[in-house]
Structures are given as C-alpha cells and as structure tokens.
Amino acid sequence: MSATFVAHVRARPETVRLAPEGAPTIAVRVEMPEVWDVVRFAVSPAEPTINLKRRALEELAPDMGEHHEDFVFKLRGWEVLDENAPLAEVGVVDGSILLLTHRRKRPVRRGG
C-alpha cells in the first residue's frame, strides 16, 4: 500500500499542516479510538513528537479537558517513550499511523 492511500482511508477531508509551506513533509495519520476519528497531518520528520501529540489532541478531543500527559502515542503497537524526540527518530515515516489514546484503561459505564 502507498502512503497516499493509507493517508486517505476514513480520514477527515482536510490535512493539518505542521510545517511551513514548501518545507519537506511526511504524511501521517493520528487515530483516536475514544472519539472514532482520524486526522491527517503533513509534518516535518524533524518535528518533536510532543508537538504532533498536542496538535492531534486539539483536533480530535478539544472538549475532553485533559492534559496531554493523560494520553499516550503508540506507533506499531508500542508506546512512544521519548515524546521530545523528533518524529523520524522514534520511527515515524511517510504513511505512518499513530494511535492516540488514554494512558490508563477507562472503565465501561453501563446504563440502566
């Protein structure tokens, strides 16, 4: 599969750009299962991971009112431990899919 194909599957129509116009970028997707939503980003491989995480939270969960420390970024099923490292350094490449989810599992509330 190509990075272009992966970037467009079930995502919002717009791409959020985190790099200056004309700068080299990679396309990544950030998925958040709690809100069943996906956002595409055009971002520099040198961008600190924490910046992408914060911007993704603004896009995907602006009303959650929680701090970014309450969430974890996962790449290929593994938690990104050094969020200050550049995206390329933690293994993000063109077409990568990052999962943004609560750090701790939350209990399921049953109605009734």
Enumerate the predicted regions with their spans.
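Ubiquitin system architectures
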Residues: 1-112
